[in-house]
Regions:
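Charge-dense, helix-prone N-terminal extensions
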Residues: 1-126
C-alpha cells in the first residue's frame, strides 16, 4: 500500500466531514513501545472504561495496515449494524465497528459516507 492511497482517504475525510476535529495517535504506549498501527482520528468520543474514568479519543479512526486501510467507527457497538449498512459497499471486509479495504476505488464511497454519517449521528457528533 502506497502512502498516496492513505493521503487520498484522509483528503476525502477532510472534504466530506470538515467540521470534525482531527488528531493523530502514533500507536505507541506510555513506554514508547509500538502496540498498534499509527491512526489518524476524526471527531472526539468519550470512551468509558469499567475500571477507570473515561478518556477522549477519536470517533472515526483511519489506519494503514499490511492489507490496506482500516476505518474504525468507535461508539457504535450494539447501536448500529455496520455489516448491514455496508452490505453493498464493494470489495471490503466489514465487522461490527471496522471497514477494511485496499483502495478507495474498490468501494462505493457513498455507502462509506452513509456509514460514517450514521456513526456520527449515533454519538451526536454530526
Amino acid at each position: 500500500m502506497k502512502m498516496n492511497e492513505l493521503q487520498h482517504i484522509l483528503n476525502w475525510m477532510q472534504s466530506e466531514f470538515p467540521h470534525l476535529e482531527r488528531s493523530f495517535h502514533d500507536g505507541k504506549n506510555e513506554q514508547g513501545k509500538q502496540i498498534c498501527n499509527p491512526t489518524y482520528g476524526f471527531g472526539s468520543y468519550l470512551q468509558s472504561y469499567a475500571s477507570k474514568e473515561g478518556k477522549n479519543i477519536f470517533q472515526i479512526g483511519i489506519a494503514q495496515t499490511k492489507s490496506g486501510i482500516s476505518i474504525y467507527l468507535l461508539g457504535i457497538r450494539g447501536k448500529m449494524d455496520l455489516p448491514a449498512v455496508c452490505q453493498n459497499i464493494g470489495k471490503a471486509k466489514v465487522t461490527g465497528y471496522c471497514i477494511s479495504f485496499r483502495k478507495m476505488e474498490d468501494i462505493d464511497q457513498s455507502i462509506l459516507h452513509l456509514a460514517i454519517n450514521e456513526a456520527l449521528n449515533i454519538t451526536n457528533l454530526y
